[in-house]
Amino acid sequence: KPSGFSQERWDALKMSAPSDLEVELFDPAGNLATEIAINSDEYFVLHVSGKVDPSVISDFKSYAALNQLLRIGIKSNDGQQTMWQSTPEKFEFSNGRFLCKIPVMISKSSKSGPYRLHVAYYFKELFQREIFCR
């Protein structure tokens, strides 16, 4: 557990996975991407938002805690290779929801696809969706 957290607070936070998740991928032009067309190495932007239990929201905002709990990324379809995985550094909060926007470099050399967008919280998969390459 991160320093500054009592065991009780840490346990409460671990059990309070975000709910009502929305995960969207946007292409470099800012359009919603349902599939990925890779012509060159390109930056896509992954938007992840969800609802956080009000009792843990101040702890949830701690970067040290999120760094150990939240994983957002893109996996290859066999699940073996995680192309990209990260804890975002910037969160926006409003009305009990968080939003983070994460730049994702997708390289044309990795164009096999399909990939899976995924969000996990304390090792538990909360969300995944296939995204195809063309």
Specify the residue positions occupied by each region the protein language model found.
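Short, compositionally biased P/S/T/A/G/V-rich stretches that sit at domain boundaries
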Residues: 1-44
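Non-catalytic macromolecular-recognition regions in eukaryotic signaling proteins
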Residues: 18, 27, 65, 85-86, ...
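Acidic surface patches and DE-rich sequence motifs
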Residues: 27, 76-78
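Beta-strand elements of modular eukaryotic interaction domains
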Residues: 35-36, 61, 106-107
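Internal, hydrophobic beta-strand segments that form the core of beta-sheet-rich folds
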Residues: 44-49, 66-75, 100-134
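Short amphipathic, basic-aromatic surface patches that mediate peripheral association
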Residues: 49-63
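Eukaryotic beta-sheet cores, primarily in C2 and C2-like/PH beta-sandwich modules
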Residues: 58, 69-75, 82-84
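Solvent-exposed serine/threonine-rich low-complexity stretches and specific carbohydrate-binding patches
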Residues: 79-96
